[in-house]
């Protein structure tokens, strides 16, 4: 068994192109011995966002705090709020933006592909 408290896991800024004001706490990954899924806590400051992107891994997300907009198409945006659960299919484009006044916090899981740790995703071709 592995037990961690989220505050004991360092927040790591995501400095990839198209990301702003976002950090991740990699709670449980392949580095911890997870065989199939990684569990991550994503935090986005007010006005922050991730890029409009897709990857081969599915995403299961649960929104803990904040008000945000999910963009899944060039012209389609959906309001998301704390308590919402979301499934994004493999290679489904998406972007999360924090449109609220407080920190956005969401739990995000991704499957572990061979050779992956859960800290990164696999771009769609």
Kindly give the residue locations of the regions a language model identified.
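A short hydrophobic beta-strand segment most commonly corresponding to one strand
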Residues: 41, 87, 102-117
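Glycine- and acidic-residue-biased ligand/ion/polar-headgroup-sensing regions
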Residues: 57-68
